[in-house]
Amino acid sequence: MFRSALFLLLAPLALSHTTFTTLYVDEVNQGDGTCVRMNRDANTVTYPIEPLSSKDIACGKDGEKAVSRVCPAKANSLLTFEFRAWADGAQPGSIDISHKGPCAVYMKKVDDATADNNAAGDGWFKIWHTGYDESTEKWCTEKLIDNNGFLSVRVPSDIEQGYYLVRTELLALHAASDAPPDPQFYVNCAQIFVQGGGSAKPETVSIGEGYYSLDSPGVKYNIYEKPLQLPYPIPGPTVYESKGVEERSVCPAQKRTATAQNKGLKPAGCILQRDNWCGFEVPDYSDENGCWASSKKCWDQSDVCYKTALPTGISACDIWMTKCNGIDEACNSGDFNGPPNKGKVLTPEPKKLAGSTQVFKRDVRKYKKWTA
């Protein structure tokens, strides 16, 4: 189909740099693009935030546009983020080796993770970061490359149950000491619902327009200086230190009103998942008119699948197109009892995590209070 061919033509243009594509919760693959806010342009999906002063620094380009799915996690769950140089995985690689720098992960509690325009602004707290590991002489991005593009963190065990945005941030410093400085931030957000937890309310910062300054030592840092000026001053606030969950009594009324996830769940009847889109079985039919009517409903869904696909790929849409072709073949051959393979789940088995889930050694040195 034309849309499929067009997507393949555009894909090579998105080779540059990196982007977060896939969330794993406790080592379970949620699906490419599922629950992930990302740049929806395949040509620029792996590009850094420009300009640095943009509010896109919160969740990336198109980061104020929510997706329909929210991935469930638990307090203390292991979140693993996969980064790719090619969003659809057409070629291997996570980020160019020259793009050396720190990594950080933030969270923000929101009323509704499926709502637009809730990324930039107050409410963010950092749950993990690491910069330059003097024991291995490697930057976080170098460790990321060594680990096939996988980066893992733990959800704090004591934060409140509810909806959260989880913000990943990679900073490439290869041009940060240029004149003018050109630090490259790669930012995306995942939508999750944290189950369990406690009542902790971490101190937060506002991330948006003007959050980072080119005058910040960690932003304009010279990675080529010998010896390096260490310790490296990681940009942003200090990491929130989880205190664990205290035992506390909960009255029946509180239990009845406790928040439960009711948004962003996988729809019932979904037989094919493509990032945040689902394909649904077409109506039964027993005559020629019904057969072609169901064929049309299948192709209507196919059209939406191709038109709304994230840069992570259209392979699921190709699977759906095969289903529609099968219905057409049945209609043309006079087989008017269907649909064929009714209700068969077509979503491929998700790939296994291909890297270590060990959390990279965190930089725990104390710095002076950070200012942007």
UniProtKB/Swiss-Prot annotation:
Disulfide bonds join C59-C189. It is an enzyme of class 1 (oxidoreductase). Its cofactor is Cu(2+). GO terms for molecular function: metal ion binding; monooxygenase activity. GO terms for biological process: cellulose catabolic process. GO terms for cellular component: extracellular region. Its EC number is 1.14.99.56. Lignocellulose is the most abundant polymeric composite on Earth and is a recalcitrant but promising renewable substrate for industrial biotechnology applications. Together with cellobiose dehydrogenases (CDHs) an enzymatic system capable of oxidative cellulose cleavage is formed, which increases the efficiency of cellulases and put LPMOs at focus of biofuel research. Cu(2+) binds at H17, H99, Y186. Binds 1 copper ion per subunit. Keywords: Carbohydrate metabolism, Cellulose degradation, Copper, Disulfide bond, Metal-binding, Monooxygenase, Oxidoreductase, Polysaccharide degradation, Secreted, Signal. Induction: Expression is up-regulated on steam-exploded bagasse as carbon source compared to glucose. It is found in: Secreted. It catalyses: [(1->4)-beta-D-glucosyl]n+m + reduced acceptor + O2 = 4-dehydro-beta-D-glucosyl-[(1->4)-beta-D-glucosyl]n-1 + [(1->4)-beta-D-glucosyl]m + acceptor + H2O. Residues 1-16 form the signal peptide. O2 binds at H174, Q184. Lytic polysaccharide monooxygenase (LPMO) that depolymerizes crystalline and amorphous polysaccharides via the oxidation of scissile alpha- or beta-(1-4)-glycosidic bonds, yielding C1 or C4 oxidation products. Catalysis by LPMOs requires the reduction of the active-site copper from Cu(II) to Cu(I) by a reducing agent and H(2)O(2) or O(2) as a cosubstrate. Belongs to the polysaccharide monooxygenase AA9 family. This is AA9 family lytic polysaccharide monooxygenase C. It comes from Aspergillus tamarii.
